[in-house]
């Protein structure tokens, strides 16, 4: 976590890009898990979900860093990239919550 009192809009944007990148990689893994289920390749699902979770953990840590800075009263000039990152992260977390259910439907 940064010790600066105020982060620049560019710094915050870079954190937003990281959240987009890691949650985007997680989303890709989760969608691939669903495709594997569709093809009957159920043995690949757990590894893909594990990979997704690792990326989500990193993205979530970045989000937590921003929340902690906000709670400390730091001035955060939040731009659209950070908002986009938050959207990516939350929708991917939702996808992870339901991916096993979707795969189970294909199993039947």
Over which residues does each language-model region extend?
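Terminal alpha-helical segments
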Residues: 1-108
